[in-house]
UniProtKB/Swiss-Prot annotation:
One of its GO terms (molecular function) is zinc ion binding. It comes from Haloarcula marismortui (strain ATCC 43049 / DSM 3752 / JCM 8966 / VKM B-1809) (Halobacterium marismortui). Part of the 50S ribosomal subunit. Forms a cluster with proteins L3 and L14. Binds to the 23S rRNA. Binds 1 zinc ion per subunit. The gene is rpl24e. GO terms for cellular component: ribonucleoprotein complex; ribosome. Residues 48-60 have a biased composition (Basic and acidic residues). This is Large ribosomal subunit protein eL24.
């Protein structure tokens, strides 16, 4: 039974049969939901600094709760 995975970059759910799984030389795997996420990761951009990622949205919500 296929299962839903989570994008390791932006945090969104990846439907079965979609997305990209990158296997590193050491055997670790990284799942991407789109080429947008894959390219931003390759460029070394931090997901927490991009407004469209769930990671950044989660941190923004925590900052608002503290204020």
């Amino acid at each position: 039974m296929p299962r839903t995975r989570e994008c390791d970059y932006c945090g969104t759910d990846i439907e079965p049969g979609t997305g990209t799984m990158f296997v590193h030389k050491d055997g670790a795997t990284t799942h991407f939901c789109s080429s947008k996420c894959e390219n931003n990761a390759d460029l070394g951009r931090e997901a927490r600094n991009l407004e469209w990622t769930d990671t950044a949205r989660g941190e923004a919500g925590e900052a608002e709760d503290e204020a």
